[in-house]
Every structure is written in C-alpha cells, then in structure tokens.
C-alpha cells in the first residue's frame, strides 16, 4: 500500500472506513449499536476472537472508548482502517489483472456511489 496518514488520522478521530462508506463512531446512532465496524471484516477490531463468538468489538464499545478518551479506541479503529485500505488495494489489483471492474464495484458499493456526476450526499 502507498504511504498515507489517512487511515490512522481518521482512526484517531473516530472515523472508520467501510465498503459502504465512512462511519463516524462518535455519533449517537452508535451508542447502542452492537454490530462490529464492518461485518465480515477480518481485522483485529472486527473479527471474532476467543470468547467472542459473535464478533469483535461493537460500535457501541468503540464509541465508549472514544468518549472516555481511552487509547484502545483509536488503536483499534486505525488498525481497522489500515486493513480496509489494504483490502481495497488488493481488490483493485485483482480487478486490473482480470479486467473486471464490475466485480470491484459489487464488492465496494462506496466506489459505485462515487462514480459519475451524481448529486448524492457522500
């Protein structure tokens, strides 16, 4: 992956990247959300670990970490964001190799939404 502070800077500020678009973990909507940042993601923040069969750290717990100014929150979200961009770059390389851009847009709905001159909110 290229050298960029985007994943960690956003992670430190409670912004997580997902295939469907950005997720702001400080928002009140995450207060009671028991889902992980991105279901199916295999990063350390999202994947099931020993004792947590249903998944990794919930959005509500991550929000709590940020609100309490605990360092674990920024660390976990930064690791998730780095994993997110590594997965994106891997899929882009595969799409180039296989000339299958439509498959890339299926896997990454956020890219489809941004394509063209659409007047949709980001």
What kind of region is each of these model predictions?
Residues 1-122:
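Alpha/beta catalytic cores of nucleotide-metabolism and tRNA/nucleoside-modifying enzymes
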């Amino acid at each position: 992956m290229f050298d960029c502070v985007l994943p960690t800077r956003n992670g430190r500020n409670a912004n997580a990247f997902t295939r469907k678009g950005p997720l702001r973990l400080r928002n009140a909507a995450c207060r009671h959300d028991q889902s992980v940042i991105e279901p199916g993601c295999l990063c350390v923040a999202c994947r099931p670990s020993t004792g947590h069969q249903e998944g990794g750290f919930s959005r509500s717990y991550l929000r709590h970490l940020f609100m309490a100014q605990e360092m674990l929150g920024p660390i976990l979200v930064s690791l998730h964001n780095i994993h997110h961009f590594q997965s994106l770059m891997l899929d882009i390389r595969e799409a180039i190799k296989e000339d299958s851009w439509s498959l890339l847009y299926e896997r990454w709905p956020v890219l489809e939404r941004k394509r063209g001159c659409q007047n949709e909110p980001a």
